[in-house]
UniProtKB/Swiss-Prot annotation:
Subunit structure: Heterotetramer of two alpha and two beta subunits.
Binding of Mg(2+), residues: 191, 205
EC number, UniProt record: 6.2.1.5
Cofactor(s) in the UniProt record: Mg(2+)
InterPro entries registered for this protein in UniProt: ATP-grasp, ATP-grasp_succ-CoA_synth-type, ATP_grasp_subdomain_1, Succ-CoA_synthase_bsu_CS, SUCC_ACL_C, Succ_CoA_ligase-like_bsu, Succinyl-CoA_synth-like
Protein species of origin: Mycobacterium tuberculosis (strain ATCC 25618 / H37Rv)
Annotated ranges, domain ATP-grasp: 9-236
Lineage: Bacteria, Bacillati, Actinomycetota, Actinomycetes, Mycobacteriales
Alphabetic keyword roster: ATP-binding, Ligase, Magnesium, Metal-binding, Nucleotide-binding, Tricarboxylic acid cycle
Protein name: Succinate--CoA ligase [ADP-forming] subunit beta
Function: Succinyl-CoA synthetase functions in the citric acid cycle (TCA), coupling the hydrolysis of succinyl-CoA to the synthesis of either ATP or GTP and thus represents the only step of substrate-level phosphorylation in the TCA. The beta subunit provides nucleotide specificity of the enzyme and binds the substrate succinate, while the binding sites for coenzyme A and phosphate are found in the alpha subunit.
């Protein structure tokens, strides 16, 4: 889960990472009131989960509360790369002597953690990596040893930070690592991390991504969910612990196992080329269990998408056998009743597949078409969706 900057700075405050005071608002009047309360020049910053805010006019310096009001009026409602600005962070402006870059992230390719640090902050880090790679330090972090002050100082040193700020920067870097671990983050990024004229180190920007797989031990993270901006079908799926991502096609997809579902998306997209450009409507992995309740929840989510014209249920029976899956489908259709009103193409394979097919055949549900192979099923689902 990506956080808004103001949410990330709440975690900064929780873990004593130095930053500038500020508050969030959704009105121009609120921005003026916060600026008045701070009593100094402020930055008015669009809250969107995308980079490039400054270039798009989403970050403005306000010398007075009235300036904050005017900037807020212009920024609210702004479209930044498809993200509409609905909230603003109004934070105290800071005098800046130098700008640096610091991040911790999960390095999936090397199965470790990575610290990245550069004296070239305040610009796109991809640009630094491309034009000045020698100025960007990439330091592997041992997950067991972590980051103490000595190692944090080494990270800053490898990032070419000036000698006079190494010790101060090390303290902040160590605190950012503590946050990264304690909050189960996959990314903590500060750009810029600045040195003030009096040699303080401040995190002026904040970007944090939290690992949704750790939600079970991070109940406090639920408050960060932007439910108003989240697709209601994705919210419904999450309530049932289903892995669902809405796409823009017409064939609903239900499968067990992420790899199988990804393969199903591919074959449906390929088959859809012959049927007017039909595409998959979603990714939905029901996991290892395909009980009637789980299948009903999955069908309820997929059928709730008005774009869906047909549904492809693609299940490989393993620990959960095909007869259990078939029974789940039949019961799920009974539980949903009239809400199940779109054709289903079902392909079963694996453990006890013949019994599973027999159950579906004998049920003889008018919405269900049983198909033997994945390619044939994808073609049938695409054909039904294009009809």
């Amino acid at each position: 889960m990506d956080l808004f900057e103001y949410q990330a700075k709440e975690l900064f405050a929780k873990h004593n990472v130095p930053s500038t005071p500020g508050r969030v608002t959704d009105t121009a009047e609120g921005a003026k009131a916060i600026a008045t309360e701070i009593g100094r020049p402020v930055m008015v910053k669009a809250q969107v989960k995308i980079g490039g805010r400054g270039k798009a006019g989403g970050v403005k310096y306000a010398a007075t509360p009235q300036d904050a009001y005017e900037h807020a009026k212009n920024i609210l409602g702004l479209d930044i790369k498809g993200h509409i600005v609905k909230k603003l962070l109004v934070a105290e402006a800071s005098d800046i002597a130098e700008e640096y870059y610091l991040s911790f992230l999960l390095d999936r390719a090397n199965r470790t953690y990575l610290a990245m640090c550069s004296v070239e902050g305040g610009m796109e880090i991809e640009e630094v990596a491309a034009t000045k790679p020698e100025r960007l330090a990439k330091v592997p972090v041992n997950a067991v040893k972590g980051v103490d002050l000595d190692f944090a100082r080494s990270i800053a040193e490898q990032g070419h930070l000036p000698a006079e700020v190494l010790d101060t920067a090390a303290v902040t870097i160590a605190k950012l690592w503590e946050l990264f671990v304690a909050e189960d983050a996959t990314l903590v990024e500060v750009n810029p991390l600045v040195r003030t004229p009096d040699h303080k180190i401040l995190a002026l920007d904040a970007k944090i991504t939290l690992d949704g797989n750790a939600d079970f031990r991070q109940p406090g993270h639920a408050e960060f969910e932007d439910r108003a901006a989240t697709d209601p079908l994705e919210l419904k799926a999450k309530e049932h612990d289903l892995n669902y991502v809405k796409l823009d096609g017409q064939v609903g997809i239900i499968g067990n196992g992420a790899g199988l579902v990804m393969s199903t998306l591919d074959v449906v997209a390929y088959a859809g080329e012959k049927h007017g450009g039909v595409k998959p409507a979603n990714f939905l992995d029901i996991g290892g269990g395909a009980s009637a309740e789980v299948m009903a929840a999955g069908l309820d989510v997929v059928l709730g998408d008005q774009q869906v014209k047909s549904v492809f249920v693609n299940v490989f029976g393993g620990i959960t056998s095909c007869d259990a899956v078939a029974t789940g489908i039949v019961k799920a259709l009974g539980m949903l009743g009239d809400e199940a009103n779109k054709p289903l193409v079902v392909r079963l394979d694996g453990n006890n597949v013949e019994e599973g097919r027999r159950i579906l055949t004998e049920a003889n549900h008018p919405l269900v078409t049983l198909v033997a192979t994945m390619d044939e099923a994808a073609d049938k689902a695409a054909e039904l969706a294009s009809a």
